[in-house]
Amino acid sequence: MKYLLIKFVRFWQICISPLYPSSCRFYPTCSHYAILSIEKYGAFKGGMKAFWRILRCNPWNKGGIDYP
């Protein structure tokens, strides 16, 4: 499951993300954060951390440096 999620995020980074303007307010980007957190915490907890990060990446959040 972990590898499937990472493959999905990599697909997003390579195929879909270049079609949209860069708008992530954090470093590392949300997709890179997702890969790091899934590798570190596993599919469920890492996926939840990535989901929470995506929810926080919006115009009302300051952003900044945020590692998993």
From Swiss-Prot:
It is a peripheral membrane protein. It holds the Pfam family YidD. SMART domains: Haemolytic. It is found in: Cell inner membrane. It comes from the Bacteria. InterPro entries: Membr_insert_effic_factor_YidD. The keyword ATP-binding does not apply. Keywords: Cell inner membrane, Cell membrane, Membrane. GO terms for cellular component: plasma membrane. Belongs to the UPF0161 family. Could be involved in insertion of integral membrane proteins into the membrane. NCBIfam families: membrane protein insertion efficiency factor YidD. This is Putative membrane protein insertion efficiency factor. It comes from Hydrogenobaculum sp. (strain Y04AAS1). The lineage of its organism: Bacteria, Pseudomonadati, Aquificota, Aquificia, Aquificales.
